[in-house]
Amino acid sequence: MGLIGWFSEVWQSMGCFLSIVCWLMKKMFGNIAVVGATGAVGSIVLELLESRQFPCRTIKFLASKRSAGKRILFRGEEHVVAELCPDAFKDVEIVIASTPDEVSLEFTPWAVEQGAVVIDESGAHRMMEHVPLIVPEVNPEAIDHHRGIIASPNCSTTQMAVAMKPIHDAVGIQRVVVSTYQAPSGAGLNGDRELLEGSRAFLDQTKYEYQTFTHPIAFNLIPQIGSEKEAGYTSEEMKMVHETRKIFGDESIQICPTCVRVPVVNCHSESMLVETRNPLSVKAARNLFEEFKGI
């Protein structure tokens, strides 16, 4: 059966990220730290925390030494960004983190040793056996098995997993052929900048030096996201394979992904062809989607 799902990158990826926090907050209410607060994802985290009136006693904002000292406006008040260091997590109960993998591997032990639960948006811990990889609409029960770190999946994985969930539960999924159309924002602030500045240079017929992407992104499609991996797939594509199997606890699901960078500012989209284990009509599939929370 053919199914096309269109989702917003920010809502699905960051919505999943904060939904994990909300799930935890059903059981605890305390002091929050946002790591990577000045980055592209961190700024969206702050917007969502504010728009959802997220409940907490205190909140602190942490970033690298280079960004420490910057000021952030949150809930009408100005906050100074503190430097990320071992002492920064004293009395912190929940850490919401969006950093490069190597930074995550360095600071998460500091936070966990001081009793905090780290919700990590990076890829550093996703495939570690003892770290649950959570999409709240798909496998919320796995969150109870954390040992201080809860991983959030890659954005393209999250989109696909949410669409797969009602079908997988109803009739099982044998195989998924998925194509993604991902915005430059997935590469951070530099990705957006190269799209906008490169587009202007193209229209003005001036030269522009691209650094974030392997080819010009303005008015172009780049069929490679991440580095090249086994069998000609890219690292982004292999994330979709391995992470999805872990989330569903099903190593038998066959996934054939193609990830393409497209010249739009914010949205990621996916087209999915799903082969089910048992018969399912289009009408029945539509009904499953209509009844499923999160779609």
For the regions a language model picked out, list residue spans one by one.
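Residue-identity detector for glycine
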Residues: G2-G5, G15
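Charged docking surfaces used in two-component/phosphorelay signaling
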Residues: V95, P184-I295
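N-terminal Rossmann-like NAD(P) cofactor-binding subdomain of oxidoreductases
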Residues: K26-I217, I253-Q254, N287
